[in-house]
Structures are given as structure tokens and as C-alpha cells.
Amino acid sequence: MTQIFNFSAGPAMLPVEVLRRAEQELCNWNGLGTSVMEISHRSKEFMQVAAESEQNLRDLLKIPSNYKVLFCHGGARAQFAAVPLNLLGERSTADYIDGGYWAHSAVNEAEKYCTPNVIDVKTRVDGLRGVKPMREWQLSDDAAFVHYCPNETIDGIAIEEEPDFGDKIVVADYSSSILSRRIDVSRYGVIYAGAQKNIGPAGLTLVIVRDDLLGKARRELPSILDYQILADNDSMFNTPPTFAWYLSGMVFKWLKEHGGLAEMEKRNQEKADLLYSAIDGNDFYRNDVAVANRSRMNVPFLLADAALDKVFLEESVAAGLHALKGHRVVGGMRASIYNAMPLEGVKALTEFMADFARRHG
């Protein structure tokens, strides 16, 4: 059987070692004779899973002790509502940095609860799409917080700078780049991330929130989205997505065993460099993102002749390269190369691309 490399933007590829271990444990987890999916989330066995998962995540990201880690439902879209309702307090506005599709989606949700100050940071650099540097972001004085998305999966645009806005509360949607590189958590008030891209299976959402931001929720906020309630109940205010939590915990262990975030950052840069070199070195392919803002996680590219898109996708699947179709908003192709994607997968893709260009160029 041809080895399959899954380039899906999410739900995305998981480490093979993690999947194999989960397969082995599926029907008899921890010697209990039952699946981890079947045990109570309040059992001592699962409480140990939860505690180990949180500690490993804290170790990986070096999360300071004055931050809570929440394991939630609802995906990042739920956080689009949770963030303003937890953080606005008596204020009526917040700064929303619009750098792409998902950042703008957060704006659309926030408009239900406040008057967002939308700061469009999209720009053109020598005809290529990019994002203005943070020093040019015109933040307002009365905003309750600053919200931005460091990595846009659809646009393939990344903001690699870390925020330095003094005492402003910074909120970041790290759904597609969490754990891909080292970050300074202390620069943020809230970090949230859907698990299905670079952590584990769909159904789990991580929220990292600074302690002083708890307890400020508006009265109309649903309890299940209230950071204070979730923190007080150790993320078990209701039944959490236990299997997704368990698998994500296994991924945290895998990351630590493979050198942590410093090693992931190195590997991800190597994979991205290889793929962008293949695109830039062949007139048959094109990426229209400025080099400074190119994503290391999601690499969109266009063929010289869009009429060949269907053929490219058919042949790539036959070659074991799956889920390369670009998002409907931008078209073309997109290769998502998260932590679990091995270098061998990217090499296989670039070799296929070179061969396809020779045959169809």
C-alpha cells in the first residue's frame, strides 16, 4: 500500500506513533478492560490523564503559574463569542486586527457584543500579500483588549512577531500554529486554539488565560463559556470531550519526547523552506504571499494553468498525497504541514510537483 501523507488543514494529520498507541489501547486502556472513551471523566484514572496533559502542555509552552489552562468545547468559533463576553467588562469596544479570513470571522462575531475597532493590517509588498508590522498597528486607547490571529490557514499568511503593547491585554487565536514554535505566553492575556490542526482530534479547544482576567464575565455569558466557572471546575463543569483530551495529551508527550518546541520549530522551518523552494524554483507554481509573512503551517500555491487543478488533485491522491485542494475562498492548492507531517511527506510532495510540472508544463 502506498504511504499516505495527509495535508489537510484540519482535522489534520496526527503523529503515527500516537495513533498506533491509541489503537493498541483502544479496547483495554490502562489495564481497566474498557476503552478510555467509556470511563468517567471524574474517575481517578481520567483525572490523572487530565493532570498529566495540563502539566505537559505547561512544560512545552513554559506557561507561567499565574495562568489557567482550560480544556473546552466549541472550537475557536465559540471563543469568538467567549472572548468579548469574558473580557469586555464595562467597556464597549476592543481592537480587532484584521489580517485575513479567520481574524475577520472573529470580528463578525464580536459585533454582536460590542463595537469592534477593526484595524485592517493587510498590505501589498511588491505585489504580494502581506501584513503590516506591529509597530504600524493603530491601536485605540479605550479598547478592552487587542485580538489577532497569528496564522491564517486559508490565506497562508503568518504574523511571526510577538506582541509588545505595554499593559494592553492581547488575545491571540493560535488554532493553526500552537505548539509549532516557541512563544512567550506572558505577552498574552488569552491564547486559544482549536485542537484539530496542530494538537489532536476535533472537539477540544485550549484556552490559556491569565488569572487577573477571570471573574469579569458579562451576566449574559453562557456558563459553559465562562472562564471563571471552567477554571473553578477544572474544565469539568460539564462532561468534557474525554477522548480528544486523552489523544491530545498523548501528542503533548510525543512533542516532549521529540525535543519539544525548539525541535518542532527547527523541523517546521526545514519543511516550509523545502516546499517554498520547490514553488519559487518552478514557473509552473506560484505563491503570492510576501516572504516575511509566509506561513510555516499552511502553504497555498497556484498552478500556472488552473485547468490542470483537477488533474493535479487526482494524480496527487494516487501518489498518496491527500487533501491538497485549496480553500474555496482562494482556490488552487494548499499543503498544511503541521508538526505531525514528517519531512519525508514534504519531500514526496515536492518530488511529485516537479514531476507533474515536467509532464504538464
From Swiss-Prot:
Family to which the UniProt record says this protein belongs: Belongs to the class-V pyridoxal-phosphate-dependent aminotransferase family. SerC subfamily.
Primary subcellular site in the record, as a coarse category: cytoplasm
Protein's name according to its UniProt entry: Phosphoserine aminotransferase
CDD domains cross-referenced by the UniProt entry: PSAT_like
GO cellular component terms, semicolon-separated: cytoplasm
N6-(pyridoxal phosphate)lysine PTM positions: K197
Organism: Pectobacterium carotovorum subsp. carotovorum (strain PC1)
Keywords: Amino-acid biosynthesis, Aminotransferase, Cytoplasm, Pyridoxal phosphate, Pyridoxine biosynthesis, Serine biosynthesis, Transferase
Pathway membership, UniProt: Amino-acid biosynthesis; L-serine biosynthesis; L-serine from 3-phospho-D-glycerate: step 2/3; Cofactor biosynthesis; pyridoxine 5'-phosphate biosynthesis; pyridoxine 5'-phosphate from D-erythrose 4-phosphate: step 3/5
Record-linked PANTHER family: PHOSPHOSERINE AMINOTRANSFERASE
